[in-house]
Curated annotation (Swiss-Prot):
Name by which UniProt lists this protein: Large ribosomal subunit protein uL2
PROSITE patterns per UniProt: RIBOSOMAL_L2 (PS00467)
Family membership: Belongs to the universal ribosomal protein uL2 family.
Residue ranges crossing the lipid bilayer per the database entry: none
Gene that this polypeptide is encoded by: rplB
HAMAP family registered for this protein in UniProt: Ribosomal_uL2_B
Known partners and oligomeric status: Part of the 50S ribosomal subunit. Forms a bridge to the 30S subunit in the 70S ribosome.
NCBIfam families attached to this UniProt entry: rplB_bact
Annotated region (Disordered), positions in chain: 219-277
InterPro entries xrefs: NA-bd_OB-fold (IPR012340), Rib_uL2_dom2 (IPR014722), Ribosomal_uL2 (IPR002171), Ribosomal_uL2_bac/org-type (IPR005880), Ribosomal_uL2_C (IPR022669), Ribosomal_uL2_CS (IPR022671), Ribosomal_uL2_dom3 (IPR014726), Ribosomal_uL2_RNA-bd_dom (IPR022666)
Length: 277
């Protein structure tokens, strides 16, 4: 999918870019796989903001995505490649030979009419899903499970990929895009290939209104707030932070403080941390 550059007809259009959606084959989603999605605007059940900078934006329907890929041995045909407003990756509508329809994350190179299949005996081909233990070393994968049968949780964003490095007992070593090397149970499934729509990260939003269409509200610096709104607020003019270290709006240390639990059970499954040289 290419990048479309706009002419600077207005200040908002200057430097604005978008995807050309050349890979998208239909603009009408499969109605049976849509669910209504209520706009929470970052509020919880008490009406309090729990996630800042969310609200407004265009109405959306949620597309039910098959992250489990557990219909073993049943072949499916790719019918369409579609846009999904709820994620950066595109999605593909597949029709199984037993009549079931499903959406999957569209990997790079997947085309309409292509046949895909899941299961331990599936070929190492883009779009096929297999247990990690059945995937050869060096293969690029995405949509990786962390618990067998739970569905893919890792490597689902546009352009993301991971690589199978080897096997240690019942675990398989996988290198994630961050550089982290992690041990994952060999019975967990992954899909062969890289997630498509990799040029999505190159898009220049161009103007504030386009962020609002996406439901993203402005982020205001703490230093321009009042003291009752933020620890950095107050003072005359461009005042410094006035504390030993920068703080979050709730007074906790920000910028550089490690937040990972040192006693996390998954620590023993990390072979190499993402920030190790």
């Amino acid at each position: 999918m290419g990048i479309k550059v706009y002419k600077p007809t207005t200040n908002g259009r200057r430097n604005m870019t978008s995807l050309d959606f050349a890979e998208i084959t239909t603009s009408t989603p499969e109605k049976s796989l849509l669910v209504s999605l209520k706009n929470k605007a970052g509020r919880n059940n008490n009406g309090r903001i729990t996630v800042r900078h969310q609200g407004g934006g265009h109405k959306r329907h949620y597309r039910l995505i098959d992250f489990k890929r557990n219909k073993d041995g049943v072949e499916a045909v790719v019918k369409t490649i579609e846009y999904d407003p709820n994620r950066t990756a595109n999605i593909a509508l597949v029709h199984y030979t037993d009549g079931v329809k499903a959406y999957i994350i569209a990997p790079k190179g997947l085309e309409v009419g292509q046949r895909i299949v899941s299961g331990p005996d599936a070929d190492i081909k883009v779009g096929n899903a297999l247990p990690l233990v059945n995937i050869p070393v060096g293969t690029v994968v995405h949509n990786i499970e962390l618990k067998p049968g739970k569905g893919g949780e890792l490597v689902r964003a546009a352009g993301a990929s991971a690589q199978v490095l080897g096997q240690e007992g019942k675990y398989v070593l996988v290198r994630l895009q961050s550089g982290e090397v992690r041990m994952i149970l060999g019975t967990c499934r992954a899909t062969v290939g890289t997630v498509g729509n990799e040029q999505q990260s190159l898009v220049n939003i161009g103007k504030a209104g386009r962020s609002r269409w996406k439901g993203i509200r402005p982020t205001v610096r703490g230093s321009v707030m009042n003291p009752n709104d933020h620890p950095h607020g107050g003072g005359e003019g461009k005042a410094p932070v006035g504390r030993k270290a920068p703080s979050t709006p709730w007074g906790k240390p920000a910028l550089g403080l490690k937040t990972r639990n040192k006693k996390a059970k998954s620590n023993k499954l990390l072979v190499r941390r993402r920030n190790e040289k």
